[in-house]
Amino acid sequence: MAKECVITGRKSRSGNKRSHAMNSSKRTWKANLQKVRILVNGKPKKVWVSARALKSGKVERV
């Protein structure tokens, strides 16, 4: 299973790195994902959750 937030759906994004001369090369931006235990269908489960979802209170740890 890929690293993706189960709450917000955030995952790695790709784009270009640009030098001073505006040459481009591919790079990725990785989401700040934490593996936490939360209740899924009434049972505790370890899943990937973004730090943004944890800070905003969208999910509560068990």
From Swiss-Prot:
One of its GO terms (molecular function) is structural constituent of ribosome. Residues 1-27 are annotated as: Disordered. One of its GO terms (biological process) is translation. One of its GO terms (cellular component) is ribosome. Disulfide bonds: none annotated. Pfam families: Ribosomal_L28. Transmembrane segments: none annotated. It comes from the Bacteria. SUPFAM superfamilies: L28p-like. Keywords: Ribonucleoprotein, Ribosomal protein. Gene3D superfamilies: Ribosomal protein L28/L24. Residues 10-20 have a biased composition (Basic residues). InterPro entries: Bacterial_rp_bL28, Ribosomal_bL28, Ribosomal_bL28/bL31-like_sf, Ribosomal_bL28_bact-type, Ribosomal_bL28_sf. PANTHER family: 50S RIBOSOMAL PROTEIN L28 (PTHR39080), LARGE RIBOSOMAL SUBUNIT PROTEIN BL28A (PTHR39080:SF1). Belongs to the bacterial ribosomal protein bL28 family. This is Large ribosomal subunit protein bL28. It comes from Listeria monocytogenes serovar 1/2a (strain ATCC BAA-679 / EGD-e). The gene is rpmB.
